Curated annotation (Swiss-Prot):
It comes from Pseudomonas putida (strain GB-1). It comes from the Bacteria. One of its GO terms (cellular component) is cytoplasm. This is 1-(5-phosphoribosyl)-5-[(5-phosphoribosylamino)methylideneamino] imidazole-4-carboxamide isomerase. Pathway: Amino-acid biosynthesis; L-histidine biosynthesis; L-histidine from 5-phospho-alpha-D-ribose 1-diphosphate: step 4/9.
Length: 245
């Protein structure tokens, strides 16, 4: 299982939100490229970037920062989400050296777009499913739909999606542990690899994900925990690598 540091971008700075609320943000650095360097030097094998402004505005806003990070680390797999709602945007990011694009809102509102994107950019598409009480949320989590996460995930199995990033909104940024039972249920219900996100606080939460014994859980995204020092990236990755269960 990969430990994936998150860099959330708002107005060019690296921030963390609580439960997806833009008004409840903490600025951790005004130099996201240096922040990326910190996690790379700490041994991370993939980075998770989110354009928060883009998620709310429906188009990339912090694209220059994303490109700068991708250029600095050309061999590091980078995934970007937030405001990706057109093939042109995906093409822009892929040309900039980004490994994966995460389609969120558009995947819920227009699922056929995912198949289109997978066909145009094979192996590059991840679907981001953000949920509240098992139902998918969209538009920077401002709207909660009547669509169930597992039902939607199954719909994408035939499209060639590389992974699903599953985030429990109630947990995100709260550092109270992630929703292990639902993450496990999702991983077991679909053939698509699942990356857990939201609520990871410490090594105990990483162990809980591993203890779930769901081979489909291939990664864990962590944000506030690594910024506030309750989780160490290198230690957590070593723990995953050496886990015997």
């Amino acid at each position: 299982m990969l430990i994936i540091p998150a860099i959330d971008l708002k107005d060019g700075a690296c921030v963390r939100l609580r439960q997806g609320r833009m008004e409840d943000s903490t600025v951790f650095s005004d130099d996201p490229v240096s922040m990326a360097a910190k996690w790379v030097e700490g041994g991370c094998r993939r980075l998770h970037l989110v354009d928060l402004n883009g998620a709310f505005e429906g188009q990339p806003v912090n694209g220059e920062v994303v490109t700068a990070i991708a250029k600095r680390y050309p061999t590091l797999p980078i995934q970007i989400g937030g405001g990706i709602r057109s093939l042109d945007t995906i093409e822009h990011y892929v040309k900039a050296g980004v490994s994966y694009v995460i389609i969120g809102t558009k995947a819920v509102k227009q699922p056929e777009f995912v198949a289109e994107a997978c066909k145009a950019f094979p192996g590059k598409v991840i679907v981001g499913l953000d949920a509240k009480d098992g139902f998918v949320a969209t538009d920077g989590w401002a709207e909660v739909s009547s669509v169930q996460v597992i039902d939607l995930a199954k719909r994408f199995e035939a499209d060639g999606v590389s992974a699903i990033v599953y985030t429990d909104i109630a947990k995100d940024g709260m550092m109270q542990g992630c929703n292990v039972p639902f993450t496990k249920a999702l991983a077991e219900a679909t053939r698509i690899p699942v990356i857990a996100s939201g609520g990871i606080h410490n090594l105990g939460d990483i162990k809980a994900l591993l203890d779930a014994k769901a081979p489909g859980i291939v990664g864990a995204i962590t944000g506030r925990a690594i910024y506030e020092g309750t989780l160490d990236v290198a230690e957590a990755q070593a723990f995953c690598d050496n886990y015997q269960g």
